[in-house]
Amino acid sequence: STRRETAMCDACVIESVKQRMVSRRGLLRAAAVGTAGIAAAGMGIVPPALAAGHGSVTDLTHELHEEFPTFFGQQQFFREQKFKYAEHKFNLFELRVNEHTGTHVDAPLHFSADGLSVAELPLDKLIVPLCVVDIREKAAADPDAQLTPDDIKAWIAANGDIPENACVAMLSGWSDHLGSDKFRNADTAGKMHFPGFHVEAAKFLIEDTRAAGIAVDTLSLDHGISPDFAAHYAWLPEGRWGLEAAANLDKLPAKGATLVLGAPKHRGGTGGPARVFALV
């Protein structure tokens, strides 16, 4: 009888400990969530609960590799394997890359004497509403086509005002040509032919909206044949950023998506390859 009572008491103790552990775990989880929320708020990061309305994620980043086409027509991404798994039991590559290679961000410093570096871009300007302006029809007819103020005004008429801190993206369909010479589309004289932003479109966004960034699915914010980088010089010195060689813009709605720009953070950088995606 005594043994049975002892065993029963032991079982009670074990069950009591289990219940306490469960309660403690719940408390710790709640504390962790609360602490994480406070930390996130302090860092300016949007808590997951605020993003619960998004149902899908679209990758807007092309895979970067040695043969990725570049504005200058020369290789800009290099890698050398320093450690191999077969020999060292881990793999490691050393990279050398031009900042403006692949899907990448242009910081204001890229086209100004003292603009913000890529490391200084404010977080609230990197998670923004995305407005996709579709110019595929005229880009198919003319590779030198430009996104104009009229294109933006037509978007506004159909979708409403450009939201504060938005990224206005040009969808020209040019990413379909990636992997062929038509992506650069250089003529016999070496001049490239692909769509981009008209300088007046950049000025319109500066003067009439509070957009934070512009994006293109080509190699440059300016169209390929531009002799003077007019859109770059109008846009970037105003403290705004640009995104070049974006992927999958055709998979997004004209409005309603949220762009997340995973910009690099190297000191004094004029830009850099970025991991970019959209929440829809």
Give the location of each predicted region.
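Active-/binding-site microenvironments in catalytic and ligand-binding cores
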Residues: 2-280
